[in-house]
Amino acid sequence: MKRTYQPSNLVRKRRHGFRARMATKAGRKILNARRARGRKELSA
């Protein structure tokens, strides 16, 4: 059986990266929430 998680750095960056977050209103909201919490890393 094939596992569900097949790691790929390219797909990871495209889906969860900083620029992907900045591209949508909801994504920017996520970044602001993570900044407010004081997260060291904001995105993948």
Curated annotation (Swiss-Prot):
A Pfam family per the record: Ribosomal_L34
Sorted UniProt keywords: Ribonucleoprotein, Ribosomal protein
A GO MF term: structural constituent of ribosome
Entries under HAMAP family matching the protein: Ribosomal_bL34
Lineage: superkingdom: Bacteria
Gene Ontology CC entries for this record: ribonucleoprotein complex; ribosome
Family statement drawn from the similarity comment of this UniProt entry: Belongs to the bacterial ribosomal protein bL34 family.
UniProt-listed InterPro entries: Ribosomal_bL34, Ribosomal_bL34_CS
Underlying gene: rpmH
Official protein name in the record: Large ribosomal subunit protein bL34
